[in-house]
């Protein structure tokens, strides 16, 4: 589109493509809600009083607002391809996402990020990413890839890469680790936003983190923590995900004068939640808590647009992209317009687009065979370290226990809820199998396994017996990754053949399969609401207290490996 034509359309000299007539505009610039007839030409807003248009939509008694922006999301948590993700969230008014693809990057590296970007071409939403800053997350496990300064610099040259992803290595920042600072410097040199991740950081350490050019954080769980970060110049992203839900606490920080520095994000939202809520739900909740509606919408639109340098995005105003939602007075989304075209109405996607199915390299590079011997634990001591898990928590504890021993081998002890757990390396065919014991899953028989295992996403399996563990791992390998519940044979599965993280199926099918696998784990004895969510975090060696990787047990507080036997 020529700018001359948009100017002519704004003056009424050219007929507009579309006119939204009779609505009330939520104006994120003036802070008002005022009557406006919105004219659209060539995918952009032309003006507020165009005399005619090829198509007119009456939006009398409705609110008009910019399309929502999810300021930080790991799309891999949805287990959906970008096209299917769009089908789920576009009808709810989310038209731009800032995705941090560090999950697929840990498996496939730069190729994984490029794959997602190619698959997102042509979908009715703006799919942008940040360059993952911490791949791998630690040196305590085997990942599928590593992103150094050169890879990050190359990624940041892509216009779709709008920043450096969350800098989880805050110790490396404040202690001036050279490779860490090099990543920050290259992002700053390219004028890209630098995203943060600093749960619980305060005082001088927080000031040091902010001084390193960190610009935002989505990890705050307490209002006091968020206010301290705001005072240090760090913008706050209020998060409402599946596991981490911080909205009710963080609405306490919202003041009339600080709202330009607050944004909204989902971070990690699984498919069972994504079909029911997204940024639209957060906006309604914030308004219900007493926040001015215009301020609530600013947090989901113009604020993240400015934060990430998205020019001509995040507002309904002349010269801005026509990414628009039409809402009723309860702030429910009724119509969605992306780049000037209506793409959804009354909760249903109306746009037609191709769901790309591109070839992707295998991510199951396991040294075979996997046998009962792979999970054998010789009884070489009297007291063992057991990973203790609790319902709806990702923190673990270290439990000292006397193991059940048979014929000189440690076996699972279902009476005391102590089961075998193993992490099988799947990226480089190293043959690494980390072995341990875990309490809290409650399985009485069989095994469950997953290739979703933060952050390196090796295969993790928990089982009552070695034979079931073998079958579970073999089942995952054969289907290219996913979730399985096994009782003699595989009784339920959720295939995730794309990097062992993503499904090619529709969101409804993914939800059904996920629920079936979780139900199957309950039939094996688990009382956890979501045993696979708990399983996926057992191998994350950056969250206290005791974890397991393909290289063995990790004491997170000591940031090092520890033996299974304490004595």
From Swiss-Prot:
CDD domains: AdeC. It comes from the Archaea. Its cofactor is Mn(2+). It catalyses: adenine + H2O + H(+) = hypoxanthine + NH4(+). Keywords: Hydrolase, Manganese. Transmembrane segments: none annotated. One of its GO terms (biological process) is adenine catabolic process. Its EC number is 3.5.4.2. InterPro entries: Adenine_deam, Adenine_deam_C, Amidohydro-rel, Metal-dep_hydrolase_composite, Metal_Hydrolase. GO terms for molecular function: adenine deaminase activity. NCBIfam families: ade (TIGR01178). PANTHER family: ADENINE DEAMINASE, N-ACETYLGLUCOSAMINE-6-PHOSPHATE DEACETYLASE. Belongs to the metallo-dependent hydrolases superfamily. Adenine deaminase family. This is Adenine deaminase. It comes from Methanothrix thermoacetophila (strain DSM 6194 / JCM 14653 / NBRC 101360 / PT) (Methanosaeta thermophila). The gene is ade.
